[in-house]
Amino acid sequence: LHAGHIQPVVEWLDPTQAPGNDVVRLRAVRVRAESGIITDRFDIRKPIDLEVEFDVVKAGHIFVPVFNLYNEEDVLVFIAHDRDQAWQRTPRPTGRYTSTARIPGNWLAEGMMSVSSLMMTEDPFRMHAHAPRTIGFRVDDSGTGDSARGDFHGRWPGVVRPLLEWRTKYLPA
């Protein structure tokens, strides 16, 4: 992320300079708040949208947009493949597409995150475009007690910090 600087968006205005090949080219990778605003800081309790914009320049190919998310310790937090049923195993016509993956609120841990975006065919495997760690953002926990942290203020390690649904049964003595 450019010597520690995080940027929430990268755009390739010149398609010849964009990651890709003769059939598909990335045009932009962005991170957005639920409101649609591009930002580099997120409240841990709120959803985060990862977005890739791409041009299909040659019709008839099947593509899967992919995001790889890394934390500040360069640990791979997750890999997400687009499973939108409308495009699953469907050859795409030429045109511009925008695919968005939503990370639920109360799921990531605090800290800096970087995002790689890829465009691939799964079967048979073929990598069409790869934009490694081009965007990034920071996740912050306000410590107000309504996140997974609750009222605990000590160090909380881990690559995710989900606020899980808990149920407790009580049996009186």
Language model regions located:
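Localized sequence-composition bias
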Residues: 1-173
